[in-house]
Structures are given as C-alpha cells and as structure tokens.
UniProtKB/Swiss-Prot annotation:
<feature type="binding site">
    <location>
        <position position="1090"/>
    </location>
    <ligand>
        <name>Zn(2+)</name>
    </ligand>
</feature>
<keyword id="KW-1278">Translocase</keyword>
<keyword id="KW-0479">Metal-binding</keyword>
<feature type="binding site">
    <location>
        <position position="175"/>
    </location>
    <ligand>
        <name>ATP</name>
    </ligand>
</feature>
<dbReference type="Pfam" id="PF21090">
    <property type="entry name" value="P-loop_SecA"/>
</dbReference>
<feature type="binding site">
    <location>
        <begin position="193"/>
        <end position="197"/>
    </location>
    <ligand>
        <name>ATP</name>
    </ligand>
</feature>
<dbReference type="GO" id="GO:0005524">
    <property type="term" value="F:ATP binding"/>
</dbReference>
<dbReference type="InterPro" id="IPR027417">
    <property type="entry name" value="P-loop_NTPase"/>
</dbReference>
<feature type="compositionally biased region" description="Polar residues">
    <location>
        <begin position="1057"/>
        <end position="1067"/>
    </location>
</feature>
<keyword id="KW-0547">Nucleotide-binding</keyword>
<dbReference type="GO" id="GO:0005886">
    <property type="term" value="C:plasma membrane"/>
</dbReference>
<comment type="subunit">
    <text>Monomer and homodimer. Part of the essential Sec protein translocation apparatus which comprises SecA, SecYEG and auxiliary proteins SecDF. Other proteins may also be involved.</text>
</comment>
<keyword id="KW-0811">Translocation</keyword>
<keyword id="KW-0862">Zinc</keyword>
<comment type="similarity">
    <text>Belongs to the SecA family.</text>
</comment>
<keyword id="KW-0997">Cell inner membrane</keyword>
<keyword id="KW-0813">Transport</keyword>
Length: 1106
C-alpha cells in the first residue's frame, strides 16, 4: 500500500469527504419531498410565491435603509456624499449575504418543488392550474400554454432546438447531489448522459427566487437556445421569466429585457461582449446588463480553461492599416521558404547517405545534416518518417546535446548555413544572416530588415554638437526610421510563421474567402476569433484572400476576469478532475465528482502504438471494418479537419458508409449525431467536446456491445481524451474505447517518443507491428501531464498580466459608470478637485504651483510664497480646495442661470415639439454641443444642463484616455520581455511600469476634466451697442435620442495560443519582436461617418462631445 492509499484509508479520499458533506442536504430534500408532492397544482405554485416572499423579507430592513440613504443624497453636501455611497455599498453586500442565508434555509423545499413539477410533467400530458396574469401573457406567445376561462393548461411537450420534445425526466438522488454542489458555488463533474442539463434546473430555480437574475452560460448558441426552450417551461410554470440573449440583437431593447428575466441563457462570448459594450455606452438607455449575481457555466472546463487564453476584444478601425505591407513582402517570404525547403531536402538526402556509411566520422556528419534538416523544417513528412526508423531519432538527439552544451555555445555552427531557424516547442522562427541577405537582394539598403541599436544611436546624438532644435529633429528621424523597420521585420516574421508553422485544414480553414481558426479542443470553427499581432493578416496574405485592415482595441477583457465578477459562480462538466488544481488556484472553484446513477460498463483499452502514421491509419480502418461487421456503431475522433477528410477517403475506397462531422460541415451536426448510435453507423468527428448531444443506442446495438470509440491520436490534454471516451457508456450502457497512436504524432514527436522509440528498437519491432502495454499508456499520459503543466503555466502567467489591466479596468469602468448614471458624478468631481489641489502643492515649487492652479483650476494661488514655505501642505491643500469648490459651485450656478431663461422659453413655447435640446458650451479652446432632456432641464431649473455637461465631458475624457492606456499597456507587455536577458522578471517590470502608466492616465483624466469644467461657459451673443436687445444664447434641437448602434464594431476573440502571446507568458521564450502601437494618423472629420458604424455623422454621434 502506497503512502497516499494509506492516508486515504485513514481520512477517506476527497470524493468520499465531499459526499459526506452533501448527503445531509439530500436527506433533507427527500424528507421535504412527500409533503410537497401531496400539494395540488395551485398549492404547488403558491409555495413558490411563498418562498419568494420569505427570501425578499429576509432583508426588508436593509432594503429600507438603502432607500432612505438614496433619498438623502440630494440634500447632502457634495463633499459628504462619498460616505453615504460607502454605506449603501456595504448594506447591499449585507443584503446578498441575507439572501444567501435564506436560500440555504429554503433549499430542501425549493428542490422538492422542482422535482415534483418534473414528475407531474412526466406523468401528465396536461396540467391544469388557475390562470394568473403571467400565464395569460405566456399563452399569447408560447404554444405549450393555453387559457380556457379562468384556467391555464400547460402541456408536457414543446419544441426545443428545432425538435418536438416530450418531458420524461425526474431527478435521481445523484442529480440532487449535483444540484446542491452547484448551489454551493462549486463545480459538479458528472459523466456523459447523467443529465447535467436537468441537474441545473435545481440551483437555477432556487437562486432565481431572489429576483436578482441567474445566468446559465453555454459554449455555443445552439445549446443556449435549445436549453432555454427545453427547461424553460419548468420555470415558467412557477411564474419565473426565461429568455436567451442569443435570440436578440446586441444593444437592443429585446436583449435588455432578456437580462431583466429571472433566468437568462446565453453563450460565454455574448455575456462578455455585452459587458464590454455596456462600458462603451454613451447613455444609460444603452446598458443591457444588471449586477452579476449568479452564473452556472455548462462545460465549465471548456470556458474557464480552454478559452482562458482568449481575451474578448471590441476594436474599431484605424484609418491606416499595414495590410499593404503583407502583400508587398509575401513574394520575398515565399522565395525564402522555397530556398529553405530545398535546403531541408538536400540535408535529409545527405543525412540518409552518410548515416548508412560504416565510417564513424561520416555517420557524425550525417546526424549533423539530419539535425540541420530538422531545424530547417521540423514538420517535413519525409523527415518525420526517417526519424521513426530504428536508432535515428536517438542519434539526432545525441547530436543536439553536443551543440547545445555550454548554453548553446556551438549552435551557430548548425544554424549558419540555414535561411531561418524554427524552434517548434517555443513556437518561434528566427531569420539568420543568410536569410536576411537573400531577401535584401540587390536593395540599396543592406540593413533593410535589420533593427538598429536605437539606444546606441540616441546616445551618439547626445554627444554631437547640435542645437536643441536639431537634436529633436534628428531624434524624430531616428525613431521614425526605427518604427518603420520594426514594422517591416515584424511583418516578415509573422509571414514566416504563417508559411512554416500554420497548416490549412489543421489550425485554420478558408471558407468564403475568409481565414477561420479551428478550435484545437473541439474541432469547431471559432467565429470572430483572430490570431493576434498581425499573424492572422499574414495567414490571409499567404492564402491570397483579402487582408483585413488593422484595428485598435477599444475594450477588452478575458473570460477569466469576466466570470470572477459574479457574486457566486458554479459549473458543470464531464471532465474537470484533471484540471481541479487550476480551477481552485485561479477561480477558487472546488471540483466535486458526482457518482453515476448506474455503474459505467464501458471497456477502456490500452493505447495501440505504431511506428508511423501510415501503419496507424491502416490499423484504424481495419478496426472500423471489424466493428461494423459486428453490427456496432463507431465514433472516430480526430484532431483536425485534414485527418477526418483523409480517413473519409480511405473508408470510401473500402466502400464503408460513414458520416463526417468537422469544422467545415458543422451545419449537419444535430442530424449526424442523432444517427451516430444506429447499428453499423460510422461517424468521423473532430473532437466531440461540447457537442452537448448524447448518442442514444437501440436495444440491438446494446446487445452487440454498444458504441465503439476510436481515437486516432492522443490529444495534448487528457481531459479532451476523456471527453471522447465519455461519449460511450452513458447511463450504464455497454461500450468500448481505444486510442491508436504513432511515434509521428505531434504529442509523441515533441514530448514522449524518445523512450518509447528506444523500447521498440530494443525489442526489435518492425514496421507494421503494434505495441500495446499499460507502461506505454502511462508514458503517454506523463507526456500529456507535461504539456498540461506547460499550458497551465502559460494561462496563469497570462492571467497575472491581465490582472494588472483588470485592476485598472475596474477603477476606470467604475468611474465611467458613475458618470453615465449621474448619481455619483458629483462625488467623483469633488475627489478630482481635491486631487488637483493636493498635487499642485505637493509636486511643485511656488511658481510651479501658481502655474498649475491657473492652468487646471483657473484660479489664483490663495496663499503667499512665505505661507507656501512655512505652512503644512495639508493645510494649504484644504484652503485651496475650499476656494476651488466655491469657484466651481459659483460657475455651475452661473451656467444654469444663463441657460435657464432659454430652456424656459423653448419648453413653454415649443416643448411639445422637442424631446432633447443641444446647448453649446465652450472652455475657450473647443466648443462642446451638450445634449440634454428638455423636460428634465426645465423642471430642474437647468441644473440638469450642468449634469449633462459634466457627464459628457467625463465620458469623453475617460474613453480617450482608456483607449490610449490600452495601447500603451499592449506595447509595454511586448517590450518588457527583454528584461529576462538582464535576469529580471518581465512580469515584475510590467507591474511597476503599468502603475506609472495608470497614474499618468488618472492625472490626465483629472486634469482635462477639471480644466474643461472650470472654464466651461455658454457663449452669449452680445447685442449691438445701438440696439436695446437682450443677450442671446443660441440653442438647437437635438436629434431624437437613439440607442447606440455598435453593430459595426468588430468583436473578436484574440487567440492567445499563438506564439506572440505565449511570449508574454513564458520567460524563457526566445527574443520577441517589438510591437509598434497602432498609430491613428488621420483624425475623423466632423462630417465624416462615425467610426462606431451607426451610420450617423461623427458630429451627431461620438463627436457630440468632441
């Protein structure tokens, strides 16, 4: 007995402890169930209303206190409001805690209500209840409810995901276990076919009773729509509203209503993008989301782990892109790649000839030539085949060790004759001097593709005898040239990666003239995802499709940081146990394995290992043929579109009928999966993860041995392999699974084949022979663990980088939301004024202080130089702040006084014609047209005009500063990688530098906002001296208020699995290319179309405040 087994025998394993903790809850539910089941239909529904009332009343006093504090805000001095808002925030947290306690108390009854309802729908075709207003509203839009007199009749069948569904499910005890786990904010791991969708109904129903909203998150829109239709009637029967955000257009009233529903279904991407859109809104009417209360994430491992490297980005166009550069440099790269291919072939031929020699020196030269061929093109199929021969790979690895000794001391001898060097494990391509010479050719500038040492050049300039003007001019010239060269070198590198490391129909497909990334985990097309840092444009140039223009990031967030905003988060999946450590480290989510309702009868066989891919695929086809003859259905899992199409051709040649499900044919998914369990059916599918549809078997198929799973390759992640195996053996069905592996597979080639190859060599295995042993399967699993650890390191590192931005984003978005909603804007402005006063005194001498107070706060210094030197800085800051606040109040009152007669006149004479009014306000430099609701302005005696001015300026200043900050952070992330050469941690440097950038941004926001607000005045047209007419303010009718149209912003998931992003996550990655920030060189004209895509002119949209 091992030590771990010994400990488990004393303390029990985790699974046993989890079950022990949850079992009492299940017993309470079972005890409450008979009483609930005995209720009639109306009493059952009344019980739900009773629970809602109990939960709401648990925090009655706290809610009353919040309302009282909110009512007191208007009469509270601006300076004292911060304390009031802090009290409100504290009490709102207490309310959530009270609700959580109440939910625990009613859990057994609530779960019993759901189970009793499921039973009634299963046993009755129709359920008759007394009709409520909600039922009548429902009957007008849903087919499964009809009204007859004062009765509402619910049917037990409805349409879900395009199929007619009859409800026939009642919760098992293990599903009650799962429901408790989800309510507790944990991850429930349940095997395929155990009814995860049904389990979710329990915690969703319970948490929806608070009225704060529950989000059910799925991986694709088909599942989101299907599950909302499938489970919806169960909730609606109890008066809970259900909607799905993917049914409605972004930024629409319908989508806003979907978020106001008690239960909201949707995809992870859309929830994230709606959050970003809300933080770009220019009016409260544009907001769709409310507080992030409780989310249940389906296929939680896919969302929180596989997609974690992929931030959501909303970007807008920049006037000038670098797409032309990709087209211009493509022929040079093609010439380079062809030259390298010829070189790789030459070295391989040379290696084969020399290694066959009996001369020891020639054999050594042969292995050097082989190693050079490997460095040229590691994915060369002829090379991979030769490496699988006995003793060849081991010989090449010995050669590699020799040249890598003493920190790669002799590596230059290997790489000098090559045009570029590929490091496959590091995902990097480096040009050599020979490669640079080839692409420079007869160019006048031999350094066309060589980055100069900019620091040395700038230092040289300082030593020259130049005037300040000349020095600045020369510096500008140097920096401009460096930027141009940097972009050129970067483009060449990205094109090289596109040609040598990314294969069509493997990493991506080309459909309708567009390059679309294929998700390596699921085989699905990732719509809207683009590789970052110009790599996607490079692939577009390679495939000769339209190269999309460059864009600038307007808003971004990772799914990790989005989901961490929820008050409570839980998830369910069939495979999370292998990633339990990561889910706890990053999200503090505990994984609980729920036992199956019936024991699993699937037979999982050892891996079958072959030397070459050719032998492996031949064996796969023979195995399929044998299984089909036995009358069993077969599901063949592949890792790429290319392999699925190749196997399809091989089966067609053998005249075996089959279906193919891959990224190119995903439209037929439901139809193909529905038939996959028929006798003799053969289905080839790129990884089935997240398909969300069970393969049901007929009695004849079960008798023949059930569904057979064949994996054609081990995936990098054990979890994806487990997902594929899990398609067979659902709910105790028979089945089998086996993986066919070759030493040429990517996982084996890069991480594991050395040991297995040497074992096969020693045992004298010949081509065509197969090895099957537990030791081999364990060795492959160790390789997978190695890759998983590496990927976890990358994700954790990326999250550490994003955490820096996330803290900044939280501050900026909070400030922006205050401005948008208007409630706390006064408090923020007071803080800004204090900050400016304190800064002016803290960071300057007396003259500097005078200048800053004049420039920012438009005020004279209220103390003498002697007082400045002798008095405490806090005292001076307080004195300055008090005077600044008096000035500010006086100016805002004056603004309202000037606007009010005009507002009064327009409202009383033409109020029925206008809803909004445009008021011109200037700070002496620029004119701002402020849109304000005419009625609100009239009723507030133009105080609303001042609020609208403050809000417009703050939103405008924050948005511009945040965009610029995102750009600078992106550039910083790339530039800090060089710190590793100085034995410094790039992340630490990034954190320190980002604080400096953030402080500069906050100062900029505060300075600009206060400067404009302090100088803001309505321009008054003076009457001519000889005419006795009053002064006149010019106002205009504003366009009717519209919701912000964001339909033409580009939403994308930036793929962080590409090398450029991994660089930021791995310190030992080779030297990275510096990324130049995207330069918005051309400004948008006032009469040009607005870049947001609304179709309106810039001056009438985002340019209103500009």
């Amino acid at each position: 007995m091992g030590f771990n087994e010994f400990l488990s025998s004393i303390f029990g394993n985790k699974s046993t402890r989890d079950m022990k903790e949850i079992k009492p809850w299940v017993e309470k539910i079972k005890a409450a169930y008979p009483e609930i089941e005995a209720l009639d239909n109306d009493a059952l529904r009344a019980k739900t209303e009773e629970l809602k009332k109990y939960i709401r009343e648990s925090a009655t006093d706290e809610r009353a206190k919040v309302e009282e504090l909110k009512a007191s805000i208007e009469s509270t001095e601006l300076e004292d409001r911060e304390e009031v808002f802090a009290q409100i925030d504290k009490i709102e947290k207490e309310i959530l805690e009270k609700y959580e306690k109440a939910l625990e108390e009613v859990l057994p009854v609530a779960f019993s209500i759901v189970k009793a309802t499921a039973k009634r729908f299963t046993e009755n075709e129709e359920i008759v209840v007394t009709a409520t207003e909600f039922d009548r509203h429902l009957a007008a839009t849903k087919d499964f409810v009809r009204i007859e007199g004062d009765k509402a009749i619910y049917q037990n069948h409805w349409n879900a995901g395009g199929n007619d569904t009859v409800w026939n499910m009642i919760h098992y005890d293990v599903q009650l276990f799962g429901g408790v786990v989800l309510h507790k904010g944990k991850i429930a791991e349940m095997a395929t076919g155990e009814g995860k969708t049904l389990v979710a109904t329990l915690p969703v129903f319970l948490n929806a009773l608070t009225g704060n909203g529950v989000h059910v998150v799925t991986v694709n829109d088909y599942l989101a729509k299907r599950d909302s239709e499938w489970m919806g009637p169960l909730y609606m029967f109890h008066g809970l509203s259900v909607d799905c955000i993917d049914r409605h257009q972004p930024n629409s009233d319908a989508r806003r209503q979907a978020y106001l529903a008690d239960i909201t279904f949707g995809t992870n991407n859309e929830f994230g993008f709606d959050y970003l859109r809300d933080n770009m809104a220019i009016s409260p009417k544009d907001l769709v989301q409310r507080q992030h209360n409780y989310a249940i994430v389906d296929e939680v491992d896919s969302v929180l782990i596989d997609d974690a490297r992929t931030p959501l980005i909303i970007s807008g166009p920049v006037p000038k892109g670098d797409d032309q550069l990709f087209e211009q440099l493509r022929p040079l790269v093609e010439r380079l790649v062809e030259a390298q291919k010829a070189l790789a072939t030459k070295y391989l031929s040379e290696a084969k000839r020399l290694i066959a020699s009996n001369d020891k020196k020639e054999v050594e030269e042969g292995f050097l030539a082989l190693y050079r061929s490997h460095k040229c093109l590691p994915k060369n199929k002829a090379l991979i085949k030769f490496l699988s021969e006995q003793g060849i790979k081991a010989g090449m690895l010995k050669t590699e060790e020799i040249y890598m000794e003493q920190n790669n001391k002799r590596m230059h001898e290997v790489t000098e004759p090559l045009y570029f060097v590929i490091e496959e494990k590091l995902n990097s391509v480096d040009l050599t001097d020979k490669g640079i010479d080839l692409i420079t050719g007869n160019s006048e500038d031999p350094t066309l593709f060589v980055l100069p040492d900019i620091a040395a050049q700038l230092s040289e300039l300082e030593n020259q005898n130049l005037t300040n003007e000349q020095l600045l001019e020369k510096k500008d010239e140097l920096l401009t040239n460096y930027a141009i060269k940097s972009e050129r070198v970067h483009t060449i590198n990205q094109l090289l990666k596109a040609y040598t490391m990314f294969e069509k129909d493997d990493e991506y497909v080309v459909i309708d003239g567009q390059v679309k990334i294929v998700d390596e985990q699921t085989g699905r097309i990732m719509e809207g995802r683009r590789y970052s840092d110009g790599l996607h444009q490079a692939i577009e140039a390679k495939e000769r499709v339209k190269v999309e223009a460059a864009t600038q990031t307007f808003a971004t967030i990772t799914l990790q940081n989005y989901f961490r905003m929820y008050h409570k988060l839980s998830g369910m999946t069939g495979t999370a146990e292998t990633e339990a450590g990561e889910l706890w480290d990053i999200y503090k989510l505990d994984v609980v394995v729920i036992p199956t309702n019936r024991p699993i009868a699937r037979k999982d066989m050892n891996d079958r290992v072959y030397k070459t891919k050719r032998e492996k695929y031949k064996a796969v086809i023979e195995e399929i043929e044998k299984l089909v003859q036995a009358g069993r259905p077969v599901l063949v899992g592949t890792t790429s579109v290319e392999i699925s199409e190749m196997l399809s051709k091989m089966l067609t040649m053998r005249k075996i009928e089959h279906s193919v499900l891959n990224a190119k044919l995903h439209q037929k998914e439901a139809e193909i999966v529905a038939k996959a369990g028929f006798s003799c059916a053969v289905t080839i599918a790129t990884n089935m993860a997240g398909r969300g549809t069970d393969i049901k078997l007929s009695p004849e198929v079960k008798a023949a041995g059930g569904l057979a799973i064949i994996g054609t390759e081990r995936h990098e992640s054990r979890r994806v392999d487990r997902q594929l195996r899990g398609r067979a053996g659902r709910q105790g069905d028979p089945g089998s699974s086996v993986f066919f592996v070759s030493l040429e597979d990517d996982l084996m080639r890069l991480f594991s084949s050395d040991r297995i190859a040497s074992v096969m060599d020693k045992l004298g295995f010949q081509e065509g022979e197969m090895i099957e042993h537990k030791m081999i399967s364990n060795s492959i699993e160790r390789a997978q663990k190695k890759v998983e650890e590496n990927n976890f390191g990358i994700r954790k590192r990326l999250l550490e980088y994003d955490d820096v931005m996330n803290k900044q984003r939280t501050v900026v978005y909070t400030k922006r939301r205050h401005a948008l909603m208007g409630e706390r804007i006064g408090m923020d402005i007071v803080n800004m004024i204090w900050d400016r006063c304190a800064n002016a005194i803290e960071n300057n001498d007396y003259e500097g202080c005078q200048m800053e107070l004049l420039q920012t706060l438009a005020m004279e210094t209220p103390f003498t130089e002697e007082e400045f030197r002798n008095e405490k800085k806090d005292t001076l800051a307080e004195k300055t702040f008090n005077i600044a606040m008096e000035n500010f109040k006086r100016k805002t009152e004056r603004l309202a006084q000037i606007a009010n007669p005009v507002i009064k006149q327009v409202y009383e004479n033409q109020g029925h014609m206008y809803e909004n009014i445009l008021i011109p306000i200037t700070d002496g430099k620029r004119m701002y047209n402020i849109s304000c609701n005419l009625k609100a302005a009239y009723e507030s005696e133009s105080k609303e005009v001042v609020k609208a001015f403050e809000k417009s300026i703050l939103l405008h200043v924050i948005d511009e500063a945040w965009k610029e900050n995102l750009r600078e952070l992106d550039e910083l992330k790339h530039s800090v990688q060089n710190a590793s050469y100085e034995q410094k941690d790039p992340l630490l440097i990034y954190k320190l530098e980002s604080v400096t950038l953030f402080d500069a941004m906050v100062n900029k926001i505060n300075n600009q906002t206060i400067s404009i607000l302090m100088r803001g005045q309505i321009p008054v047209q003076e009457a001519p001296a000889d005419e006795q007419q009053p002064r006149r303010v010019e106002v205009r009718q504003a366009a009717p208020e519209q919701r912000q149209d964001m339909s033409k912003y580009r939403e994308q998931k930036q793929d962080l699995s590409d090398p450029n992003q991994q660089a930021a996550a791995s310190q030992d990655t080779r030297e990275q290319q510096k990324r130049e920030p995207i330069r918005a060189e051309k400004t948008v004209g006032r009469n040009d179309p607005c870049p947001c895509g609304s179709g309106k002119k810039y001056k009438n949209c985002h340019g209103q405040n500009a």
